[in-house]
Amino acid sequence: MSRGQIIHSGHFMCSNPHDDLVQDEDEEDVEVDVVEDDDKSMEASSSVHHKNKALDEKPVTFYKFGVGKTQSIAIDVSLNKLNKCIKVAYNKMTTPKWKDFKGLRLHWKQRVRLNNVIWRAYYIEFRKKQPEKPKKPFCYFAVPDDDTTHQKIEGSIVEGMYWKRKMEGVCAQYKRWRIRSKHNLVTDKGGMVATCSSTSVSSMTGELKRKRKHTVPKETIESKLRSYEPPVKLQRSQTPKHTISDEFAWDFDDLDNVFTDDFLNSLSEPYMFPDPRDVYSGNNADIMQPGLLPLQPTIEDIMMSLGDDMPDSPPFHNDRDTMRTPTNDQPSISAQQIPQMRRSASSSASLHQMQVAQAQAQSISQISQPSQQLQHQIQIQQPVAARPHEFMASSIMMDYRLMPTRQSSAITSQMLMLSQSASTLSSQPQYATSTHYSTNNSFLPIRNTMTNQHHLGHTSQHSPWNKQQQSNFLVSLPHQSHVERILNNQPPLVPPPSRSNLLPTQNDPYLPQFLQSTQPTPQPQSHDPMMAPSRSWWLDSPLTASVQSPLSVATPLPLANQTGPQTPLGQLIGSADNGFLFGGNNTPGGFKMSGTTSGVPTLSQRLEQPPISRTSTIFGNVENKPERIFTSLTSQNTPTPSPLDISSLSRLRTSSLNESWKMSHIVEGSPTYQAFAASVTTKPSILESPSTSGDISGPASVPVQASQHPPKIITPPSASSKRKEQEAAMAPLVNRQQSCDVNLLNGKMAVKVEEKSGRHYLPTTPTELKEVTKEEPLLMSAPSSVKSMRRQAPDSTLHPEERKRILHLHAEQNRRSALKDGFDQLMDIIPDLYSGGVKPTNAVVLAKSADHIRRLQAEKWDKTQKIDEAKAKIEKLNQKITSLQSNLPQSSAPSSSSQVDSKTSLETFFDRYVKEGAKKNWRFWVMSQMLKPICVTQTNSFASSVAGDSSSRNEVAASCSDWLNKNWKATELRPLASTLLVSLATNSSILAEPDTLPDYVMQQLKNPF
């Protein structure tokens, strides 16, 4: 068979599998050196067995490992016997299907050999091209099979494609699918090259829906629209449309060289892949498989392999109409400092680096040109084109040390879609991506110029603080200074925009939540940039907190470097400039929890609604009631967050998704409200009250009574007060997070008020601060850690899934230990377990245990029988003793009672008379045993009825005649005879051996009882 031949199961495959040179099919089959000619059908030949019978008797064939090698192996061959088995089992064979050879006791290896012989003969006779001289077949097939079991499948049936296709065309079509848009991008030089780097994934649909300055061929538009259908029509065939005309449009070698072998060089480097449905319009199939993270090539290889056909420029083109650039596109300070980088290096930049690079340029340009911001105040969301130097500069800032080595599977696309409903209501700068419902370009930074202007207005006042203020994907108050003014009953600097400005239009993109963030601001220059690695956004995600690896959770970061983009729990309260939606009374003051509806849905409503629907929120009207204060929901919004918060925050997020966020309507003042207020303030801003007490309360102090002393949120004016804030925040946060986590994981809505002031001491010396910091590993809890939890008790501080797993593990351990103890006890109890010299298995132990139990039961039964017999003998002896004692006189005087004496004398006479008569004839004993009850033992017996005290013979004769008339009847004698026969058959072996009856009688005569 040729090497290109399709091999089905059951084939004999190859004659010489070790040969490199494959013989031509039309040539003669090459025979190996065999002693037995009968094995040629198994090795390489199908000739007839017409050799000498002497060859049939030789049991060995020598199998060589190739033509040019001298090694050989001896194989035991019994194919002549197998041939006889075939002829016996099948006189006529019709098909070469697998045969079990039922009725023949064959080893499974022999059955495989027989089926291989049958297939080989069938292949030579019907399938193979016949050579010049036809060979005599080994097996005769009566009729070739009509079924298509072993026929070569010539046409692939794929979703309605029933035509026959060539393998080259299928391969070419598959390769075109792998890089399906490359050909279109080469022809359309002006288009954006979408390589799905970390900085941009272009949406072809967004391009097509915008107005073009030049015409596009209709075929290109149709192909693009066909490739990027929304997911409602995902039931359609995913197979690309078959077009015979362009099947060989370009050379196959060019297709083969697109993805080079350089992909395998850096498989260990992690790469942040977006959601697969968000990059549904991406053009590269390799990055549409985010689940196979370690197997993906790095983006540098994709860029370099496609580098010849791509324009050497960033993926944002200012000359095209794909984006609108703002008017302040003048060279800024950073444009002259950051050098031009190579394009291929830019592909490894993550989302965070793109945000930082653009934020640097935008903040500098905003500071230098504050007057131009008023022109863009009306534009709510505006695409911003990244400059080439920003695009290149962001490529060298990637740090893979803190990126996860595997992508968590807990962030499902459905979760991301469900958390998107309030995304467009937020006025913070966002990143739009093309989901199924998107019509605009993806991953493009969209800036809210109104927010930026307001942010700029505070830059002069709180410049160091605003530099430290970080973007928080958790529910955040983006502008701390504005919230501070609200909480201090001061009027806001900029009036809140109207409701109509906040609501998006129909053309706004449907934003995924995992790309929403506030705009990151530049970090202070005092910190070493190499010491501030970027945390991946999924590390802080509440959706992935339960499945993180222990290393990713328990990695302690420097205190000053907790500045990466935070995670997307969704902006529960973020839509106006101050971070709240004002509905009703806009009077500044405390925020009241109410059931009124607004435009931003909560996370619980998002998780329970369809993807597109937008429900109401629980954060409603802001009334002039300063009793309740709802502090910032940010997790790391203070200037110097400590590493203590990482683990506790992950535990809070893990538990809050399951229990605490499932609230639809919360009434102020209820325990539910208090617990919710405690749960969402895992790390609230530090509350300071003018009271003299130094006690800082725990989570129960979040709803504070502020009628006399309205609290304020301290925002440090400079970086010099960081250490004081850190020392002041360290100890309260420990207890606050612990109690909050315990309450959340227990599911209790009542918040425990911690009143002991000793629990909340403030560390004043560096030694105390170090002691608090050293307790950090005790507070860390990784929900996905497996080995560390095995030795812990399933207390209430664990995640419910982890608690369930630990309980299940303990139950399994108890079950296995009970089984082991039981088997150990059996091995100690049962004798002769080690008689074979080998340690017995559990099955042997159980089998011998059953035998031992049966033997013990048999012994118990035998001993029970002996005990019963002994009890019967004791009973008879007691009766004998009783009868003898009853016959004794009551005194030494002569007895006057003659009745008892006469009965006893008659019994004694009967026994003596029976013994004497049985010695003469053994049959006399048999008759006496039958008559003994009626004569002696019964109450109406002869001995008790006949008057023995009378000296008159007439009276004795009269009593005898009366007794005979009453008792000597057949009805009385028949039961006695049957009872005797039953006792003889039971106590002796007369039924099997009747000759032993005389011996039995003699043995009973010797018995004293």
From Swiss-Prot:
UniProt domain bHLH: residue ranges: 803-856
Changes seen on gene knockout: RNAi-mediated knockdown reduces lifespan, which is further reduced on daf-2 or glp-1 mutant backgrounds. RNAi-mediated knockdown causes premature onset of polyglutamine-mediated paralysis. RNAi-mediated knockdown increases spore levels of the microsporidian pathogen N.parisii during infection, on an mxl-2 or mdl-1 mutant background.
Subcellular location, record wording: Nucleus; Cytoplasm; Mitochondrion
PROSITE patterns xref list: BHLH
Record-level GO BP terms: determination of adult lifespan; negative regulation of transcription by RNA polymerase II; regulation of transcription by RNA polymerase II
Keyword Nucleotide-binding on entry: no
Feature: compositional bias, Polar residues: 324-350, 499-508, 686-695
Gene3D superfamilies noted in UniProt: Helix-loop-helix DNA-binding domain
Residue segments, region Leucine-zipper: 856-877
GO CC annotation terms, alphabetical: cytoplasm; mitochondrion; nucleus
Pfam families: HLH
Region: Disordered, residue numbers: 1-20, 304-354, 488-531, 686-728
Job description of the protein: Transcription factor that binds to the E box motif 5'-CACGTG-3', probably in a heterodimeric complex with mxl-2. Involved in modulating longevity in response to TOR signaling, dietary restriction, the decline in protein homeostasis associated with normal aging, germline signaling and the insulin-like signaling pathway. Plays a role in autophagy. Involved in regulating migration of the ray 1 precursor cells in the male tail, acting in concert with Wnt and semaphorin signaling pathways.
Protein name: Protein WBSCR14 homolog
Organism: Caenorhabditis elegans
Lineage per the UniProt record: Eukaryota, Metazoa, Ecdysozoa, Nematoda, Chromadorea
Gene giving rise to this polypeptide: mml-1
